[in-house]
Amino acid sequence: MQLSQNLKRHRFPLSIISQAVWLYHRFNHSYRDIQEQLAFRGIILSHETVREWCLKFANHFKNVIKKRERKPSDKWHLDEMTVKINGEPFILWRAVDSEGIELDVFLQKRRNKKAAIRFLSRLLRSYPSPRVIVTDKLKSYNKPIKYMCAKTKHRSHKGLNNRGENAHQPTRRKEKCLIKFKSAQGVQRLLSLMGKVRNIFAVDVGRYKKKASDRRLAFAAAQAIWLEAAQGLNSI
């Protein structure tokens, strides 16, 4: 798909805007890193312009990818990690399926039963109850899963949840690249799209698991989804 050149009320063409948003959410780049990469191509803009594009268009890209990505498996891994935002601790709840597809991330202040209920409610609004949910030994999961997913088998064992724990690694790398996270709303927006981009460009492409021809086909399919979302920016 070829992108139309112009985006209403914007000075730069759609192809540049969509690439800048993709670079920020696909790789461990800061806004200034992307500014420099584009400058190497002769595209002169400020890092604030890149930031504004990401803030404005992230939710649109996330929603389009969510509609087009493949359905998750019937086995989910739920896990939490602590992130600091301006020095204040927050709990990031994350759910992935057995193949590494990220279902959702949700930033909260607590790691208690109420927080688990809110997270499960978000998941179940988007996906049917799975066959199995794997968690660590956090007791906050026990009753919410029992009553909200009555037919789901709950496996609570730290050693079984490596898939969930490994899913946090891209977040840690991005956090290190940015030095620190600065706002809860910004982190939620950033990580929500990062997960969806990773689903189609990393998990589905399978950089280390598939032969080159299959990777190229999978990348082309992921790119088609991204360009479709980019073309829809004119309707916002």
Regions found by a protein language model. Give the residues of each.
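Residue-level recognition of single "structural anchor" positions
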Residues: 1-236
